[in-house]
Regions:
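The feature captures the LRR N-terminal capping module
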Residues: 2-22
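Structural signature of tandem-repeat unit edges
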Residues: 2-9, 27-35, 48-61, 67-80, ...
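Stable alpha-helical elements in mature extracytoplasmic
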Residues: 14, 38-39, 265
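Leucine-rich repeat
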Residues: 17-22, 42-45, 224-227
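A short acidic, amphipathic alpha-helical/loop segment
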Residues: 39-45, 248-249
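Membrane-proximal C-terminal cap and juxtamembrane stalk of leucine-rich repeat ectodomains
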Residues: 250-276
């Protein structure tokens, strides 16, 4: 069929489970059990291999350059792959489609810019939580459809660009982003902003809420120094013709002097709980 699931009981023995014919023809591998450098080196010699699912391997340390110069197009980085490790940099290959839960959680030495490849589809819960030395622009590719709770909590990025594939911004996804500056644009495709999603962030430009937004969760934008987004948005635009459901007041009258809504929607906003 071109695809095979293999359980590797002893690290370094993957080649024992793959016949000579399979080595030449397999397109996809789903691996469980234990792997080491010898197993990754073996996979690099498989000329037709395009997809590797590592989500259920037991030992989660992935060697540097493990897929360099290989034919692999799709890789799943497993849960806890580098969690609480001392890695200082990461170059995520373009073949990666999924980053598992807590994959880089609490990697306090991981520093610099983070480039998320086009083609990435899923970022798990706590994926980059408490990676406090990650800085610069954070761009979520349009290909990403699933973001996990606390995925970028307690990082130090300066700007945030959200892709158009996201429909939900989950709980505390970007919370405690103390270095965020400038504008925040929520794409039209986003329907729900969950509790605490941008809690204690420091944006200081304008905020645009997309036309598809239906609900904003509790303390989604509440912050330390301001009731709305902890920074000081100078203008807020909400493109939704029907007011999104709010879990509490935004108190925008205390922190922002301008709220823009679509033509013909002013009366509806003024009549809606927490917006009026």
């Amino acid at each position: 069929s071109g695809y095979k699931t293999v359980h590797v009981e002893t690290a370094g023995t993957l080649e024992n489970y793959i016949s000579a014919d399979e080595k030449e023809k397999l397109i996809g591998l789903k691996l469980t059990g234990k792997l080491n450098t010898f197993d990754y080196d073996f996979m690099r010699t498989m000329p037709a291999l395009e997809s590797i699912d590592l989500a259920q391997i037991d030992n989660t340390t992935i060697p540097a350059s493990c897929f360099k110069e290989s034919t692999v197009k799709t890789v799943i980085i497993p849960d806890n792959a580098f969690s609480n490790s001392s890695i200082i940099s990461i170059n995520i290959p373009s073949s990666v489609v999924s980053i598992g839960n807590s994959a880089f959680d609490k990697c306090s030495s991981l520093a610099g810019n983070l480039h998320l490849p086009n083609g990435l589809q899923s970022i798990g819960n706590n994926a980059f939580r408490r990676c406090g030395k990650l800085t610069g622009d954070l761009c979520i590719p349009n290909s990403v459809m699933n973001l996990g709770s606390y995925a970028f909590n307690n990082c130090n990025f300066t700007t945030l660009i959200l892709g158009t594939g996201i429909t939900t911004i989950p709980e505390d996804c970007f919370s405690y982003g103390y270095n965020f500056t400038g504008n925040l644009i929520i794409p039209d495709q986003v329907e729900v902003i969950e509790d605490g999603a941008f809690n204690s962030c420091t944006f200081n430009g304008y905020l645009t809420l997309g036309s598809g937004l239906q609900k904003i969760g509790y303390i989604a934008f509440t912050g330390v120094s301001s009731s709305f987004a902890s920074g000081h948005f100078n203008k807020i635009y909400c493109k939704a013709t029907e007011p999104p459901v709010l879990s509490t007041y935004l108190d925008i009258e205390n922190n922002c002097k301008y709220l823009g809504v679509p033509i013909g929607s002013k009366a509806s906003y003024r009549a809606t709980t927490y917006w009026k």
